[in-house]
Amino acid sequence: EYYDQFEGSSFAAAAERIWDKKPDGVVIVPQNFDVTQAFCRRLQEQDIPFVFLDSNVPEIEPLAFFGQDSLKSGYFAGRIFMMQAGEHARRILLMKLMSKGRVASRQQEYREVGFREYMTTYYPDCEVVELSLQLDGEDGYESRIRAFLDEHPDVRHCITFCSRAYILGEYFQRNGLKDFHLFGYDMVERNVECLKQGTIDFLI
């Protein structure tokens, strides 16, 4: 069953469809903590095993997890990012994709934790400045990004832990900005196109 990863009600509806099929076991790509936990608690009460795919929520205690270690991934991203930014970088941009007041995915959250651990350890004097964009506010992205860059004219290195680095990459293309360096995640089509055009430097 498929669901919209950014909409809790979509996950809940898919979970109900799964429940109606009386499964022997379930493979789950978790959504936010609350809706995932509620579904998994029902599975546990019926002794139905489940595993997590792509994104882990260890406190829910799945039978297994298959996917990337998001904390280590964020730490690794910090290392690669700063190899490019250089030791003299004093301020960098972290773009966050938000949904209903929180980071839109657990992966983003854990990757950021790993990244900040690396930055605190090795580059404590480098300021991480956040640009938070609402998932459902795409019409306002252009003005928000422009205002941010006007306010922080010294920022040239950008990173995001969601799969939508293209939000910045396409902005750079539209506005002919060639002196920015952008790191992101996931080989989605629009990210790949920005990589080819040179407005994304690196994808994990």
Question: Predicted segments — roles?
Answer:
Residues 1-13:
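Amphipathic helical "hinge" segments at domain boundaries
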Residues 10-18, 25-44, 115, 129-191:
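Hydrophobic alpha-helical
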Residues 24, 63, 156, 201:
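Conserved acidic residues
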Residues 35-72, 188-197:
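Flexible loop/hinge segments that line or gate small-molecule binding clefts
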Residues 53, 95-97, 159:
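Short hydrophobic segments within beta-strands
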Residues 66-92, 142, 191:
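Hydrophobic alpha-helical segments within soluble ligand-binding/sensing domains
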Residues 78-122:
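An alpha-beta-alpha
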Residues 198-204:
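Structured C-terminal subdomain patch of bacterial secreted/periplasmic proteins
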